[in-house]
Amino acid sequence: MNDTTDIKHTSQLTSGDFTEAREPFALFEAWLAEATASEPNDPDAMALATADADGLPDLRMVLMKGFDARGFVFYSHIASAKGRELAANPKAALLFHWKSLRRQVRVRGPVTPVTDAEADAYFATRPRQAQIGAWASRQSRPLESRLAFEQAIAKEAAKYAIGAVPRPPGWSGWRITPLQFEFWHDRPFRLHDRIEFRRSALDVPWTKTRLYP
């Protein structure tokens, strides 16, 4: 393996010492803002890890569609693989990786469904074609052919040719409420910075720990 990529200039890394942060939400917000300014594609993309009832893990990329002190929100079909797994085991982990900044953030915690009002409000902001696609798709189910999918899309488009497209009853969102954050920043020669924030419950203060790289 070629390790020349390990030799990086300090000026490439960060502005300010993130290890001095006292709580994780403001730090994440600051890093996300920098990623939004510098990351060429989807700075809100995150890897979502779930596990089924047998404990077998699963992983996929999704888009974060909301973030505040309550947690991170994403949307999908309730009957999708992720939806079924979260119903059986309502815990998850997230990973944000911003290559242009040489940073990543890990998040772990329990998952709860968003309210119908939240799901309705977000669905109303989606492009019309995406709304129609949500009706046509049976996410994670076997599909006979691309043509069959396009025919289903055309059928739903005709059905909702006039007026607003309502949210499908089987389409909603989830919120992962963090009990753990880890902020990782690349440093030369693999001497990285890692800061972990943990709490045992939502009403317990955060404990910050610096970790060996």
Curated annotation (Swiss-Prot):
Family according to the record: Belongs to the pyridoxamine 5'-phosphate oxidase family.
Gene Ontology biological-process entries: pyridoxine biosynthetic process
Enzymatic class: oxidoreductase
Cofactor annotation comment: Binds 1 FMN per subunit.
Function as written in the Swiss-Prot or TrEMBL entry: Catalyzes the oxidation of either pyridoxine 5'-phosphate (PNP) or pyridoxamine 5'-phosphate (PMP) into pyridoxal 5'-phosphate (PLP).
List of residues binding substrate: K65, Y122, R126, R190, L191, H192
TM ranges: none
Oxidoreductase as UniProt keyword: yes
Catalytic activity: pyridoxamine 5'-phosphate + O2 + H2O = pyridoxal 5'-phosphate + H2O2 + NH4(+); pyridoxine 5'-phosphate + O2 = pyridoxal 5'-phosphate + H2O2
Pathway(s) per entry: Cofactor metabolism; pyridoxal 5'-phosphate salvage; pyridoxal 5'-phosphate from pyridoxamine 5'-phosphate: step 1/1; Cofactor metabolism; pyridoxal 5'-phosphate salvage; pyridoxal 5'-phosphate from pyridoxine 5'-phosphate: step 1/1
Amino-acid positions noted as binding FMN in the UniProt annotation, renumbered to this chain: R60, M61, V62, L63, M64, K65, Y75, S76, K82, Q104, Q139, S140, W184, R194
EC number of the protein: 1.4.3.5
UniProt cross-references to InterPro entries, sorted A to Z: Pyridox_Oxase, Pyridox_Oxase_CS, Pyridox_Oxase_N, Pyridoxamine_oxidase_dimer_C, Split_barrel_FMN-bd
Gene: pdxH
Subunit structure: Homodimer.
Cofactor(s) this protein requires: FMN
One Gene Ontology MF term: FMN binding
Name of the protein in question: Pyridoxine/pyridoxamine 5'-phosphate oxidase
The keyword Flavoprotein appears for this protein: yes
Keywords in alphabetical order: Flavoprotein, FMN, Oxidoreductase, Pyridoxine biosynthesis
A Pfam match: PNP_phzG_C
